[in-house]
Amino acid sequence: MSELPQYKKDFLKSAIDGNILKFGSFLLKSGRTSPYFFNAGDFYRADLLNSISTAYALTIDSLPIQYDIIFGPAYKGIPLATAATIKLGQIRPRAKYAVGRVLVRDRKEAKDHGEGGNIVGAPLKGKRVLIVDDVISRCTAKREPSPRLEKEGGIVAGIVVALDRMEKLPAKDGDDSKPGPSALGELKKEYNLPIYAILTLDDIIEGIKGLVGEEDIKRTEEYREKYKATD
């Protein structure tokens, strides 16, 4: 595997140092016990927010897609998209981000007074929308924003998340020995959308060498081997 870009190394180290990326034994909603856990909601200090916003901005800056609006879905996506938009303006002050890209967010509960509705920010009609969120772990967790945006006339151009676990969805019959697709792969297929991540599980395993113990690395590699998706 090729060496990780410096911004990925920096992001990974800050996630470990800030206890956002933890190693141990964690029970997931899927019922699986994972040797690692990532919680983007723990990026609450200024230095950590700077780290994640920089990582999002540099990832977005490298994307081969065109977009007009950055969208942060409620709830975790809102601060992430906001921070990424600000950082994009800082790293490219005279480029397209400073003048042409704007931020939109939604509410989980529609407002029936004032401006009303679920969407807050710039008009979406005819605009290409880039969704910024935290983690794709199950298909159902990320399915809601696209229909909402399309209802407002937006065109979803892609999704950027902090982490792609590269993990197959739980089998309906409970037999996890069977090969299967990931949540990210199913979402790509259902909506025909490009989806990008700052880090993948492969990146984590490559990047944590020298940062965590050998036993944690071994357990994470074994978990990847057992649950890695086919897509």
Swiss-Prot record:
The enzyme's first-digit EC class, named in words, is transferase
- The catalytic activity of this protein is classed by the Enzyme Commission as 2.4.2.10
**An annotated Gene Ontology molecular function:** orotate phosphoribosyltransferase activity
Named in its record, the pathway it takes part in is:
Pyrimidine metabolism; UMP biosynthesis via de novo pathway; UMP from orotate: step 1/2
SUPFAM superfamilies per UniProt = PRTase-like
PROSITE patterns of this UniProt entry? PUR_PYR_PR_TRANSFER
What are its GO cellular component terms? cytoplasm
| Coiled-coil positions | none
Q: Report the Pfam families cross-referenced here.
A: Pribosyltran
Catalytically driven reaction(s):
orotidine 5'-phosphate + diphosphate = orotate + 5-phospho-alpha-D-ribose 1-diphosphate
Which positions are annotated as binding 5-phospho-alpha-D-ribose 1-diphosphate?
A: 29, 75-76, 107-108, 111, 113, 133-141
A GO BP term here is:
'de novo' UMP biosynthetic process
Q: Which residues bind orotate?
A: 37-38, 137, 165
Known NCBIfam families for this protein? pyrE
What is the stated purpose of this protein?
Answer: Catalyzes the transfer of a ribosyl phosphate group from 5-phosphoribose 1-diphosphate to orotate, leading to the formation of orotidine monophosphate (OMP).
Entry similarity comment: Belongs to the purine/pyrimidine phosphoribosyltransferase family. PyrE subfamily.
> PANTHER family in the record, alphabetically?
OROTATE PHOSPHORIBOSYLTRANSFERASE 1-RELATED (PTHR46683:SF1)
Q: Enumerate the HAMAP family for this protein.
A: PyrE
Q: How does it assemble?
A: Homodimer.
* Name the record gives this protein: Orotate phosphoribosyltransferase
